Amino acid sequence: MSNITDPQMWDFDDLNFTGMPPIDEDYSPCRLETETLNKYVVIITYALAFLLSLLGNSLVMLVILYSRGGRSVTDVYLLNLALADLLFALTLPIWAASKVNGWIFGTFLCKVVSLLKEVNFYSGILLLACISVDRYLAIVHATRTLTQKRHLVKFVCLGCWGLSMILSLPFFLFRQAYHPNNSSPVCYEVLGNDTAKWRMVLRILPHTFGFIVPLFVMLFCYGFTLRTLFKAHMGQKHRAMRVIFAVVLIFLLCWLPYNLVLLADTLMRTQVIQESCERRNNVSLALDATEILGFLHSCLNPIIYAFIGQNFRHGFLKILAMHGLVSKEFLARHRVTSYTSSSVNVSSNL
């Protein structure tokens, strides 16, 4: 596809979501020919994710909070994961509405929902990294770590939230509502004449310390954890880790594609990778598609707990029995059938 050199045909500012002011006077604009994703499909997807996340994560938090006596260290981490997903889910109606007429909610909401999106992502991977370290120390080194003391776990979680806020702060500071010529308003970073330089900083540094480093920590810890479990033939403990492994896998499947496409977009914006109209169109569409996948993650963890976490199901039934919604006989039968698959001091109550 050849570039269209007439600047009246296409304004670089018109690019959606990741659009930014021109960074090079010699840049030759091109017409965006790739079809965008059907906005109604996106809206319906966001609406379903919002409802499922609101219901599912509320139930997860309820089950964990009800199990005061038997709450494990991992439960505290998963409680914070559910809280992060729940807070992000509250912004999904706004993201859905922005797909219709662009960003019509002003600069303040642009900053707030962008902050919640980034905090949800970073807190998620940091908490999962903490779980991996805790499981590594408990299984590989067979020791009760400092995080076994519940009050210290709370400080670790507060540290994860604080670091997530710091990594996400640039999006709160620099994002604003912007209305390009001949296009719908957008919500993105406005960084002045040094947009290219600062965009690289704002993307590479947070994703290095908020994604790549925690990812390698998880790969290291779970690699040695699995090795220890298989060598020792610890089948029961291996089954107890299924929920945690599933949570980590789903997180990576949902967010890794978006971050890889975002990296490609950044490298093209900063001229590290040569940009062409075809590449720009493909990356723009890929960003839209993978962003939806990332947003869907907020409703998936409760589904994992419901299908894999036997103790989560039992905890939920216990709450129902306390309120007379199921019989105690049914609860007792469920406890007997799930007893052989439960674990002690290895996994969470989920």
UniProtKB/Swiss-Prot annotation:
Coiled coil: none annotated. GO terms for cellular component: external side of plasma membrane. The chain crosses the membrane at residues 40-66, 76-96, 112-133, 155-174, 200-220, 243-264, 286-308. Residues 1-39, 97-111, 175-199, 265-285 are extracellular. CDD domains: 7tmA_CXCR1_2. One of its GO terms (biological process) is neutrophil chemotaxis. This is C-X-C chemokine receptor type 1.
